[in-house]
């Protein structure tokens, strides 16, 4: 019985503990800043965990601070994350801590931006050179090969700012009639974009186009032109986020001339991370495709995004319900497991008590039989001598030659023998009644 109970308990334990054999991974995500575009990426990464439930994400944002990002990555290293996804703030300043993580055996995915080191596991992001080249070619076509342009770049020293400028300038080499009369840095920020555009209006006019390296700076530049009541300057940006007040809406409404979809694709980032962690094949350099957004396609793209957002909301709601049901199911499994354990323990106790009672009863029966046998033997041992005494005494009493004194003594002996015989018989009868 103990063997069977042990087998059942072991089976229950294995069933309860073996709910998920997949290894759980912890992935650290180090963002260089906080903005709508990075929020979109983070949300896509979280959505991807709905499909890949063996990954847990930890997020950190450095707010464009190199020192803070270094500290955050060091903390991820200290915590022993399984993989790092990093968007480095600048090319040079973050390289050493990324190298440190890589040297410790932590896989590193560079997303969106690069460093000056080759110590990374994989890169995924748009081709910023191609993005800049596309925007340069678009502006040149709109200007028909002649005009004055100003460029508002992102953070100086960051790989997107460097590569977008390089692609932009290379595209314009084919159009000698176009001159870039000003290049300013606005650190990807809307307010700085407005401030730098103020300076361009003050010092570098006239200009026909402004190439801002993201939509926030482009909208900031637009606000500067509106503030100065200047018309005729066309502004393009990059990102084309389909959010209220974002680049795509601004293009649809005619406020920006064009933008370029700078893809996030958090789903592909997560898939790349899991391919690395689970030792599946992957490409080291992965370039995401974007697309030019003009008034011709902006409205259609916004409609598509609206429908996608609805589906995403439904999926998020469904995932929340599934999580609730799974939590209830897991609780029920725990209750069933505990109930099964208690039931088996009760059965085991009952079997133990029953066996104890049976053994005790057998011992008592053996003890009773031993006592009965003892008293039977004793009675036999007593009755035999008493009988041997009683018969001769009875015979002698009947002898006529006895004097009265002798007869009286023999009668006393006869009575005592009878009393002893009666006592032995009563003891035996009492034991029989006691034993049932």
Report the location of each language-model feature.
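Hinge/cleft segment of the Venus flytrap/periplasmic-binding protein
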Residues: 17, 156, 171-172, 268-341
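An alpha-beta-alpha
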Residues: 27, 31, 45, 133-178, ...
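Hydrophobic alpha-helical segments within soluble ligand-binding/sensing domains
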Residues: 69, 124-149, 192-194, 218, ...
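Hydrophobic alpha-helical
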Residues: 83-102, 168, 182, 186-246, ...
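Flexible loop/hinge segments that line or gate small-molecule binding clefts
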Residues: 91-130, 141, 148, 154, ...
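Heptad-repeat alpha-helical coiled-coil signal-transmission segments
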Residues: 325, 329-332, 336, 346, ...
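Primarily the dimerization/phosphotransfer
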Residues: 359-400, 408, 412, 418, ...
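Hydrophobic heptad positions in the DHp
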Residues: 417-420, 424-425
């Amino acid at each position: 019985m103990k063997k069977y109970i042990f087998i059942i308990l072991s089976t229950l334990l294995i069933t309860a503990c073996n709910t998920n054999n997949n290894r759980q991974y912890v992935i650290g995500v180090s963002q260089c800043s906080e903005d709508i575009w990075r929020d979109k990426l983070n949300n896509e990464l979280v959505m991807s965990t709905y499909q890949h439930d063996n990954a847990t994400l930890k997020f950190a944002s450095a707010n464009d601070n190199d020192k803070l990002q270094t500290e955050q990555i060091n903390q991820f290293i200290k915590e022993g994350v399984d993989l790092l996804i990093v968007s480095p703030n600048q090319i040079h300043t973050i390289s050493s801590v990324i190298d440190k993580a890589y040297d410790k055996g932590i896989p590193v995915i560079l997303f969106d931006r690069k460093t000056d080191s080759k110590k990374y596991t994989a890169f995924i992001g748009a081709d910023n050179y191609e993005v800049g080249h596309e925007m340069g070619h678009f502006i040149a076509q709109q200007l028909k090969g002649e005009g004055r342009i100003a460029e508002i770049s992102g953070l100086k020293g960051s790989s997107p700012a460097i590569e977008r400028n390089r692609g932009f300038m290379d595209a314009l080499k084919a159009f000698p009639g176009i001159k870039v009369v000003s290049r300013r840095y606005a650190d990807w920020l809307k307010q700085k974009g407005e401030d730098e555009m103020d300076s361009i209006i003050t010092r570098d006019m006239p200009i026909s186009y402004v190439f801002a390296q993201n939509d926030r700076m482009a909208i900031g530049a637009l606000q500067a032109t509106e503030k100065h009541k200047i018309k005729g300057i066309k502004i393009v940006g990059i990102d084309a986020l389909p959010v209220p007040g974002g680049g795509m809406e601004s293009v649809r409404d005619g406020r920006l001339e064009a933008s370029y979809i700078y893809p996030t694709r958090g789903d592909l980032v997560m898939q790349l991370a899991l391919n690395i962690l689970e030792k599946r094949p992957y490409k080291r350099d992965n370039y995401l495709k974007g697309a030019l957004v003009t008034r011709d396609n902006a409205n259609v793209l916004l409609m598509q995004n609206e429908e996608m957002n609805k589906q995403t909301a439904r999926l998020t709601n469904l995932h929340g319900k599934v999580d609730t049901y799974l939590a209830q199911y897991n609780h029920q499994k725990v209750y069933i497991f505990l109930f099964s354990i208690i039931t088996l323990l009760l059965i085991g106790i009952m079997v133990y008590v029953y066996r104890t009672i049976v053994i005790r009863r057998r011992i008592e029966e053996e003890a009773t039989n031993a006592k009965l046998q003892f008293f039977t033997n004793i009675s036999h041992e007593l009755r035999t001598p008493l009988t041997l005494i009683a018969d001769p005494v009875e015979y002698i009493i009947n002898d006529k030659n006895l004097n009265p004194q002798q007869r009286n003594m023999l009668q006393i002996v006869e009575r005592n023998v009878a009393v002893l015989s009666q006592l032995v018989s009563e003891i035996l009868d009492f034991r029989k009644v006691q034993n049932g």
